[in-house]
Structure formats: C-alpha cells, structure tokens
Amino acid sequence: MLKRASFVEVNTHSLRHNFNAVKNIVPKDACVMAVVKANAYGAGAIKASEIFLQEGANYLGVATLDEALELRSHFSQTPILILGYSPNTNASMLIDNDLSAMVFSLEQAEVFSQMALKSQKRLKVHLKIDTGMHRLGLEPTFKSIETIKKIRALKGLEVEGIFTHLSNADSNIKTHAKNQMKVFNAFLEQLLDQKIEFQYRHAYNSAGILSLCNGNENRLLNLYRPGIMLYGFYPSNEMKESSQTILKNVISLKARIVQIKRVKKGEFIGYGEHFYTNEETLVGVLALGYADGLVRALGNRIQVAINNQLAPLIGKVCMDQCFVKLNDIEAKEGDEVILFGDKSTKANDASEIATLLNTIPYETISTLSKRLERVYV
C-alpha cells in the first residue's frame, strides 16, 4: 500500500538487461563494479544492488559514507568502494564496516593507517590517479610512485586497487579519453616495472565501456564501473546515436490525479500568474512537486501521459503538488499520470526532460527524492 499518490516506478527487467549489456561488452574475465551512488541514480540503491549482485556484480560503488553504510546494512559480505572523498574523521566507520576507501594523498593514508592499527583491523583502499580530469587524485609522476611505495608500506592498509576517471569519453572525438588511458597505462607499467601490482585496476565508466572496449586502451584493466548505462541512458546524445548497444528505460516518474476541478474562464492556476484560463478548464491536481524532483521550471513546458493521451502540465510546479489540464482528455480522479518514463507510454523520457532543461539525464533521475516510494515491477 503506497503512502502517497506519487511514486517512482522501477523496471527490474530493464535493470537486469542493462547490467548484462555491460557483461556482453567488457572482457569475459573482467570484474564489474555497479555504481549505485545517489540512491542508484534514483532507482533505489538496495533493490538495484540486489539485482546487480544477482546478475554477477563483483563490487558496488558509491560516493559517500552514508550511502556505503546503507548498503552494508543489507549486504554484509559485498565489497563496497566509496569513490568520493572520505574525511579523516570517517576512518573508524570505514574500518568497522569493512568498507573500501579512495585515497589520493600520503597524509590521508597515514591517518587511515593509524586508525586501522588502533582497531587492529585492515582498511582496503584504492589509489586515485588524476590523468587529466583535474579533480581528485595523485599526479602520474615519478614522485607519486615514491608516494605510492610509502602508502603501500603503511601497516593497517591493504592497497587493493588503483584507478582513474575519464572526463569526456562520451564525445565523438576520443582523443582526450585515449590520451588519459595512454597516461594511465604508462603509469601502471612504470609501477609494474618496480614490482608494484594491484588486485583491481579500473578506469572505464559507462562512456568508456560503450566506446573504448574495442581497442587496446583497456589492456591493463580488470574492473569496470558502469553507472548511467545501468539505468537505461547513454552518457551523451552522441553516444546514443552511435552506440550499437541497446539500453532499456528503468525509471518512470508517476502520480495519480487526486482531485479534478472545473475552473471558470479568466482565473489563474497555482502560485503567481503563470497560467491563465482563457476558457473553462478542467484541472487535475497531482500530489507531486519540486521537492520530489519534478523541476519547477517544467510548468507550462511539457506534456504528460494519461491513459495513453497527452495533457499539458500547467502553472508553476509547487513544492508538493502540480497541475495538468484535462480538457479533451478522458480521465478521472485516481488515474495514473506519467510525468516521464518509457517512450512507449507516449510520455517524455528523462533524456528529453534533461534536454529541455539544458542538463543531462543523470541530474533528472538522480535528484528524484527519497520521499517518493519506489515501486518495482
């Protein structure tokens, strides 16, 4: 029984299909880290992780300690890597919950080592290398090799992996991505020359998986990190047009009509004066708003699907509610409205919503609030 008249519908068959699409692309003996940060990009981290693990995921990737702890409470043995920054104050929680952390400096590693020794436990870490995104990471230099030697010598740490992140493998021109991999591979080879090896070596996100697995740039990799493609979206429109891989929509934002009102001509609907009734208007009120992840700016800009018909979203989206115009639409209170989802329903998909808002589908789906229940079908 749903507690609200709005929800996120998650297609579990599509989750399985998309994960297996990854498995069909990466090398047969490769490991896969399913990235389930931001509540699995809106799909619900626990259920999505359960499905990915059933389908053969070897590792789960998140961005924050809280996300990792939520997963650990359900998956006691599964390897979980926090891909984002972990403050030194989180060290004891990382150790006590057998979580893996990203490390990018000797100072950070020393703190983690000290805490691990106090706990008489070991903390697994993955070293982040900055090959050209210029976010977090050690520079791929001789000096960093010396730093890595010092980190590996610290007691209490298990330096399990090394990785980098590709910044624009989703573009048509792969020069920068290939240059990043050239730098990363050269650095790995320099480390190997000094007998420094890692259980896991990873770099490819969804864009890398979809576009760079046919060359030899990934020859030293053995772990792959799919994110957005698991949830049915290509990293860019360019990739959608060029990819041979079929991905299936996972997430639909839905609500039910909670009241239908007949509003006379000459009235304004909702806050401000953003929709004027130039005729008698049937207005359907939905219990869904921008606090749920339906962007306020979508008012008066999109059509939604009701009983296989298209109806305009009118007025400004409120924090908890919004309006649809039902003139010439067969609808009644309680009927389902699809704000975005599978194209077969006539609704926009999240990619089209993102284009309208001059953003990317990552943002459209990952900002869907946790106060919306997830319904798995």
Swiss-Prot record:
Substrate binds at residues 135, 319. Its EC number is 5.1.1.1. The active site is at 37 (proton acceptor), 271 (proton acceptor). Belongs to the alanine racemase family. HAMAP family: Ala_racemase. Catalyzes the interconversion of L-alanine and D-alanine. May also act on other amino acids. PANTHER family: ALANINE RACEMASE (PTHR30511), ALANINE RACEMASE, CATABOLIC-RELATED (PTHR30511:SF0). This is Alanine racemase. It comes from Helicobacter pylori (strain J99 / ATCC 700824). The gene is alr.
